[in-house]
Regions:
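C-terminal accessory "lid"/substrate-recognition subdomains
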Residues: 3, 147-322
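Phosphate-binding P-loop
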Residues: 3-10
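Short hydrophobic/aromatic beta-strand immediately N-terminal to the Walker A/P-loop
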Residues: 12-14
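The conserved Walker
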Residues: 19
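Conserved lysine of the Walker
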Residues: 23
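Hydrophobic positions on the alpha1 helix immediately C-terminal to the Walker A/P-loop
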Residues: 26, 30
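Conserved nucleotide-sensing/catalytic segment adjacent to the nucleotide-binding pocket
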Residues: 36-43, 49-98, 109
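ATP-dependent NMP and nucleoside kinases share a basic, alpha-helical "lid"
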Residues: 101-149
Length: 322
């Protein structure tokens, strides 16, 4: 049925993380910039094997691989990578049940996010960019309670109970996928958050894998300097026993400075400059409960991830012309 809109093989971006870690928020910004017509967007929750009532009755959590049709998600990702349409299942989080299947057509960019996109070697090999979201645990809990109690029909106490039940499966099946990520993104509460309790001003660390393709952000870091403490810092730190490049985004960054840095980052992506929205207006959007907010640290994080994706697109195009 459908086919990709160019002769180039689709680029697949896998975004992994625990429940409530911000996967949808991160990927929604990417879709808004690239455009719905260029992106096939898949939430792997659609591949749950059991509905909510069955999981509660049997005690199996959605984090357990046995509660997900990993074979089908792998086959569907293979089809999309070949430029073929799929008929995919649909899981409705509001009801905890399955809706009617839907057709998903391939596109230039395929964004797949969920609990298990890096779970096995075949899934990892299908994806070109691997991202793991790893917010500090207190934030993860806050985000999950806020989301599930406002839009997914749970009470706060039910969410707390579910988090306790899921802790073991997270440790066994979700967190080990972190080791396969090209970029680990960690949101944390910094000085401005503690003064204001404002989720729009979180600190962010982007930790690159040792063998991940490098992109040059030295001019972005230089442009971020404003007095003694730059808004962005590029460091080499030990992570999991290995030296890693770490980009830190300070939650205190001003909107004006964030827009200035946006200019510098977009200058690296001249081949897709036509996609550029107004100053961060399509990026950094997140829901605090039912209220739509905007965060400059989140916007810059999404833009840097976009830069990685565009860089990988250029690499793939160069390889195909050889």
């Amino acid at each position: 049925m459908g086919s990709v809109t160019s002769n180039q093989q689709p680029l697949i971006v896998a975004v992994c993380g625990d429940s409530g870690s911000g996967k949808t928020t991160l990927t929604d910004g990417m879709v808004r910039v690239f455009g719905q017509e260029r992106v096939a967007h898949i939430c792997l929750d659609d591949y749950h094997t059991f509905d909510r009532a069955t999981r509660l009755r049997t005690g199996i959590t959605a984090l357990h691989p046995a509660a997900n049709n990993i074979a089908l998600m792998t086959e569907h990702l293979r089809c999309l990578a070949r430029g073929e349409s799929i008929i995919k299942p649909v899981y409705d989080h509001k009801t905890g049940t399955f809706a009617n299947p839907e057709v998903l057509r391939p596109a230039d960019i395929i964004i797949v996010h969920g609990l298990h996109p890096l779970y096995n070697e075949e899934l990892r090999n299908l994806a070109h960019v691997h991202i793991y979201l790893d917010p500090e645990i207190a934030l993860l809990q806050q985000w999950k309670i806020m989301r599930d109690s406002t839009v997914r029909g749970y009470t706060v106490e039910q969410v707390r109970q579910q988090m306790a039940i899921r802790r073991r499966d997270s440790r066994l099946f979700i967190q080990p996928q972190k080791q396969f990520a090209d970029i680990i993104i960690r949101f944390s509460r910094g000085s401005l958050y503690y003064r204001t309790r404002d989720l729009a001003h979180l600190d962010v660390r982007l930790i690159e894998a040792k063998d991940a393709p490098k992109i040059d952000l030295s001019d972005v870091v230089e442009a971020s300097k404003n007095g003694d403490r730059p808004a962005l810092r590029l460091l080499e730190q030990e992570y999991a026993g290995e030296p890693r490049d770490v980009l830190e985004i300070d939650g205190t960054i001003s909107h004006q400075k964030a827009c200035e840095l946006e200019d510098v980052i977009w200058a690296h992506m001249d081949t897709v400059s036509h996609l550029r929205p107004d100053c961060l207006s399509q990026l950094g959007l997140f829901y605090a409960g039912n209220i739509l907010r905007q965060s400059d640290p989140l916007a810059l994080t999404q833009l840097i991830v976009l830069y990685h994706v565009v860089n990988k697109m250029h690499e793939a195009a160069s390889e195909e012309t050889l």
